[in-house]
Swiss-Prot record:
Belongs to the DeoC/FbaB aldolase family. DeoC type 1 subfamily. It is found in: Cytoplasm. Pathway: Carbohydrate degradation; 2-deoxy-D-ribose 1-phosphate degradation; D-glyceraldehyde 3-phosphate and acetaldehyde from 2-deoxy-alpha-D-ribose 1-phosphate: step 2/2. GO terms for biological process: 2-deoxyribose 1-phosphate catabolic process; carbohydrate catabolic process; deoxyribonucleotide catabolic process. One of its GO terms (molecular function) is deoxyribose-phosphate aldolase activity. This is Deoxyribose-phosphate aldolase. Keywords: Cytoplasm, Lyase, Schiff base. The keyword Ribonucleoprotein does not apply. Its EC number is 4.1.2.4. The lineage of its organism: Bacteria, Pseudomonadati, Dictyoglomota, Dictyoglomia, Dictyoglomales. GO terms for cellular component: cytoplasm. Its main location: cytoplasm. The active site is at residues 92, 154, 183. SUPFAM superfamilies: Aldolase.
Length: 219
């Protein structure tokens, strides 16, 4: 795997609440320099990032109902529509974790379908926050996401007590098969960690340490 191939698996991420426009500018400049697949940012910063990234191949990914996922379906749909108008090209939505634990299958499938519809063909990733789930619940969530028509199952927000693990990525991939991609995120800071996730089945890596990961290739 060369630097470009690795960079194309990375969503270069900055989702902390205490950031400035200068931080977003740095993020976008790094994405252009290193060739990251996307920048993943909060919706407020989409217009600024769109201007910085015009005439590049770097996509703009944003988060929906982040980081808790406990809003209503209509609220999530509204966020997607507004973010789409601003220029978002991919959407990372947090699943309703309480509804998942309560086995509200029909509700969750309907919600995912509504969000996918609102995204108008753009990529939708559903974050399940694996650190709060049993293995049975992780499998259940992945099956629901497949049925709902989303494009990725994503491990974590990065705001929970634990992020992605190799074991979780391997489990999610075993259920996702070829119908659903897997995004690993949360706590991935080194090239070695990223490679472990990719080898376990991750199609995309969400990280705020993209530059360090790329620079670690070949060391």
């Amino acid at each position: 795997m060369n630097r470009y191939e690795l960079a194309q698996k990375i969503d270069h991420t900055l989702l902390r609440p205490n950031i400035s426009l200068l931080d977003i500018e740095r993020l976008c400049n790094e994405a252009k320099e290193f060739g990251f697949y996307s920048v993943c940012i909060n919706p407020y910063y989409i217009p600024y990032a769109k201007e910085l990234l015009k005439d590049t191949k770097v996509k703009i990914c944003t988060v929906i109902d982040f980081p808790l996922g406990a809003s209503t379906t209509s609220m999530k749909v509204y966020q997607v529509r507004e973010s789409l108008k601003l220029g978002a090209e991919e959407f990372d939505m947090v699943i309703n974790i309480g509804a998942l634990k309560d086995k509200k299958r029909d509700y969750l499938i309907s919600e995912i379908r509504e969000v996918v519809k609102a995204a108008e063909g753009k990529v939708v990733k559903v974050i399940i926050e694996t650190c709060y789930l049993t293995d049975e619940e992780k499998i259940y969530a992945t099956e629901i996401i497949k049925e709902g028509g989303a494009h990725f199952v994503k491990t974590s927000t990065g705001f929970g007590p634990q992020g992605a693990t190799v074991q979780d990525v391997r489990l999610l991939k075993s259920i996702a098969g070829n119908d659903l991609k897997v995004k690993a995120s949360g706590g991935i800071r080194t090239f070695e960690q990223a490679l472990e996730m990719i080898n376990a089945g991750a199609d995309r890596i969400g990280t705020s340490s993209g530059v360090s990961i790329i620079n670690g290739l070949g060391k």
